[in-house]
């Protein structure tokens, strides 16, 4: 994974955790959990691309893999909509910056996952 992407994930997760601690009225657990899950999935997909010699095992689980990929794209779309919604309703500049960066990262990761998946197909 690109080191900028790793630091972006870590930075955004840290910021969202601070926002969660500062605001008991807004529950960010779901978004934080989804971000962590997306990071792990993106990492594992990148590793699979780098291990192209493992193509036989990938072909054996290809049906399940495609289903998981579809599910991840649904999760990304949900996260994008949730982040956009929170961006519209917040007036706090720290939160606005965090959600803008999160939105940018989600769009980048979506593109990376698409690129990886095309390499694996």
UniProtKB/Swiss-Prot annotation:
Q: Where in the cell is it found?
A: Virion; Host nucleus
SUPFAM superfamilies, A to Z: Nonstructural protein ns2, Nep, M1-binding domain
Q: Which UniProt keywords apply?
A: Host nucleus, Host-virus interaction, Transport, Virion
- Biological processes annotated in GO: exit of virus from host cell nucleus through nuclear pore
Q: Which domain of life is it from?
A: Viruses
Recorded GO CC terms: host cell nucleus; virion component
**Is Transport tagged as a keyword?**
yes
Claim: Secreted is one of the keywords in the record = no
Principal subcellular localisation of the protein? virion
Where do we find the motif Nuclear export signal here?
A: 12-21, 85-94
Q: Which Pfam families match?
A: Flu_NS2
InterPro entries (UniProt xref): Flu_NS2
- Family assignment? Belongs to the influenza viruses NEP family.
Quaternary state and interactors: Interacts with protein M1. May interact with host nucleoporin RAB/HRB and exportin XPO1/CRM1.
Its job: Mediates the nuclear export of encapsidated genomic RNAs (ribonucleoproteins, RNPs). Acts as an adapter between viral RNPs complexes and the nuclear export machinery of the cell. Possesses no intrinsic RNA-binding activity, but includes a C-terminal M1-binding domain. This domain is believed to allow recognition of RNPs bound to the protein M1.
Q: What is this protein called?
A: Nuclear export protein
Species this protein is from? Influenza A virus (strain A/Chicken/Hong Kong/220/1997 H5N1 genotype Gs/Gd)
Organism ancestry: Viruses, Riboviria, Orthornavirae, Negarnaviricota, Polyploviricotina
Q: Which gene encodes it?
A: NS
């Amino acid at each position: 994974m690109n080191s900028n992407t790793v630091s972006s994930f870590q930075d955004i997760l840290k910021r969202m955790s601070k926002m969660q601690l500062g605001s008991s009225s807004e529950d960010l657990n779901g978004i934080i959990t989804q971000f962590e899950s997306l990071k792990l999935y993106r990492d594992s997909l990148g590793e699979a691309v780098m291990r192209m010699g493992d193509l036989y095992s990938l072909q054996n689980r290809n049906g399940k893999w495609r289903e998981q990929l579809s599910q991840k794209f649904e999760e990304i779309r949900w996260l994008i909509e949730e982040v956009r919604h929170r961006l519209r309703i917040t007036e706090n500049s720290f939160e606005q910056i965090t959600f803008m960066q999160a939105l940018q990262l989600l769009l980048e990761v979506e593109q990376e996952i698409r690129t990886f998946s095309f390499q694996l197909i």
